[in-house]
């Protein structure tokens, strides 16, 4: 017996990050019962995004053009390249207004158990990106998870072998954070990475 349209919708919603079976079922019923216009708008927006979005030839993020606006901007510092895991990470860094260089988006992180290796993350494209000697420093801004650390380590080795200066985002106590509410691993790393005033 083939799955019903409702089952297919619920299963598709379950494929989204952080959405379990109950949440997927609630969303499906909500869209079908109470927000059909919203469901139609969502379907149109998703269809449009799938039709027009592609990867930037330089930084690998999503864009509607061959080269995204950031990569095409002469106001960006082309000597700095920040490597992030996902476009959402790029967006968070942009919101800080503290960085004006360029980016490279890996579209994931190394995860051998999931079959994600250097080829899937297109490390060769990253290496080609820094080969023209415009980039003077690569800032690794992968997440501080085991997979993110492994990804940063491998990328750092590949870049260092080519004479590229590599730096890593530092870790520490968050701004406005109180020590008693901060985990010991973060405090330990903040102590190791302390700096003089």
From Swiss-Prot:
Recorded family membership: Belongs to the RecR family.
On the tree of life, the source organism's domain of life is: Bacteria
Protein name, as recorded: Recombination protein RecR
Q: Where is the Toprim domain?
A: 79-174
Write the lineage as a comma-separated list: Bacteria, Pseudomonadati, Pseudomonadota, Betaproteobacteria, Rhodocyclales
Q: What's the stated role of this polypeptide?
A: May play a role in DNA repair. It seems to be involved in an RecBC-independent recombinational process of DNA repair. It may act with RecF and RecO.
C4-type zinc finger segments: 56-71
**Keyword hit for Aminoacyl-tRNA synthetase:** no
Alphabetized, the UniProt keywords read: DNA damage, DNA recombination, DNA repair, Metal-binding, Zinc, Zinc-finger
Instruction: Give an example GO biological process.
Output: DNA repair
Transmembrane spans: none
Cysteine disulfide links: none
Q: Name one GO molecular function term.
A: zinc ion binding
PANTHER family reported in the protein's UniProt record:
RECOMBINATION PROTEIN RECR
